[in-house]
A protein has these predicted regions:
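Glycine-rich phosphate-binding loop
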Residues: 54
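Residues forming the ATP-binding cleft of Hanks-type serine/threonine protein kinase domains
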Residues: 74
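Basic, Lys/Arg-enriched alpha-helical interface segments
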Residues: 1-51, 62-69, 79-81
Length: 81
């Protein structure tokens, strides 16, 4: 599932990056913790991130019901603010 904010952020991404990011997000449904993913520290929530070049996808995982919730998508310099 996608937060509304994540959908808006995706619409502002460069068109050259969009297919790569969409493909990476799609792969999360099969493997929510792919190689290179990292659990984020300093948050009360169980948040993870994947890297796609200079872009990041921040998401949460609900293992009990097998749902990946996309929280934020953006350039690495902006995503953690």
């Amino acid at each position: 599932t996608f937060k509304k904010k994540a959908v808006k952020e995706m619409l502002n991404l460069p068109s050259s990056m969009l297919p790569k990011i969409v493909n990476s997000i799609d792969n999360l449904s099969e493997n929510p913790r792919p190689e290179g993913s990292k659990k984020l520290r300093g948050s009360d929530e169980d948040l993870w991130r994947i890297r796609i070049g200079n872009y990041r996808v921040i998401y949460s995982i609900k293992d009990s019901i097998r749902i990946v919730n996309i929280r934020k998508v953006g350039h690495r310099k902006d995503i953690y603010n």
